[in-house]
Every structure is written in structure tokens, then in C-alpha cells.
Amino acid sequence: MIPNILKEVADRGYVVFTKGDYNLNIIGVRSKSIESNKFDDTMYIVFKQNDTWIQFKFPITTDPGLYYLNNPMGVNGTAIVCEGQYRGIYKLGLHRGSYEALVQTGGKIKIYRDRNKDEILDHEPTSLIDGYFGINIHRASTRTNSNNVDKWSAGCQVFQNAYAVSYTHLTLPTKRIV
């Protein structure tokens, strides 16, 4: 039976991958909070293996940390990923040339630009743009849980705990493509 999270994804009109082993459904669920610097979102990784559904659930952030909200990397403001389905845009690579992650190389992603340098996450429709921004999916600390997002995200989707993500589940199947 298809997992409930995939039913919700399908109900929103998005494609759900149901055929084949390790055909990953990577689902980021943003919390309703607009407060920054917290790992208060959820990422589900759902796939089939030998006709059995496998589901993982991890605490993440889908939002930039406070450091980058106050110190944007560019003059247009800090990136916040817009809700949507981004099929085929990630592949296994290195985040900032340092460690294994899913990197945005296969297509554009839509973002909001938060320009006002406060602690509130702004999702202003007038700031929406799409492009290649290096919005990756990666871990925070290598050693422990990170309590705050801080410098771990300038717009990337970041796992709170590196140990929670056995990158075997996330990266081995992606040697093909997500």
C-alpha cells in the first residue's frame, strides 16, 4: 500500500514514483512557522525495494539560517525555496567542493528573495525568480545534532543530524539520478 505522504503528494498534483527499486521520492515539508534559524521542517525519503515501500523521516531546514538572512550572499537577498516539485534537478556531487551531497545541476529551481535582513522568513510573490542557485541537499555538522541553522544554510535544504541520514539511503541510489 502506498505510504500516506505519497498520497498527499499525489493529491497536490505532483508526480509520485511508484515503479522500480530505489526510485526516490524526496519530499521536503516546510513548517508553518516563519521564524528563522530552526530545524523545524521535515524531509521524507520514500522508495520501493523488492516491492516493499521504505520510508525515512528526518528533521531538516528548508530555510536559510539567521546568518545568511542578515548577511546575504548577493545583493538581491537570501534564497528561500518556493514550494513545488523539482524533478531531475539533483545529482550526487560535492557541496562547496567539500563533502557528498545532492547538488542542483539538472534544472532550475524557483526561489523567493528575502531582502530585508530581519529574522522573519519572507515569501513575497513579487520576489520570485527561477534559476541555478546552488540550492543543494546536504548535512549540517559531521559530529552532532545542530541546534540552530546559522551558517549551515544560505538557502539549501539541510539535515539537522548527519548520523540520521545514512547517506547510503540517499546517495547510493542517486548515482543514477534523482
Predicted regions: what they are:
Residues 1-150, 164-165:
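Cell wall/extracellular polymer interaction/catalysis modules
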Residues 168-174:
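Conserved small/polar residues in nucleotide/adenosyl-binding loops
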